[in-house]
Amino acid sequence: MKIRRSPKKSRPNSRSTASIIRSVVRLEERVWKTAQQRNARAFEKLVPSDAVMIFQSGIVLQPEYLATMNERTISRYEIRGVRGFMPNPTTVILCYEALRLGEEGGKAFPSSPVIESTTWIKRGRRWVAILNQETPVSG
């Protein structure tokens, strides 16, 4: 796995904001790792039951994603150009390009990269990913 951060960083308005964004980027990386490992328990700590994922194949709610997790193989992934911003103190939005190789239900993932956007919110003392959307990069 390779992770390359964008040289153009968003301009946080404080060190605290920058630190929070860095922490949330690490959580996003953990989501990818737990999905690759098919670790449902760790995944549901990061992605709650009311989360929505919008994939090229359609809209998937977290319970459905977990139920089909073993049908999905992420053999390799790469995250590039991560950018984040905080529109308010309890929300972080990340955008980046992802390349993922693998298959679901016997069909290979589309081979082109996607632009990913994930909205993280703070619930109590924890950050959770509540919305993820992938958009194909045309080419």
Locations of regions flagged by a protein language model:
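A beta-strand edge to alpha-helix "cap/lid" segment located at domain peripheries
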Residues: K2-G139
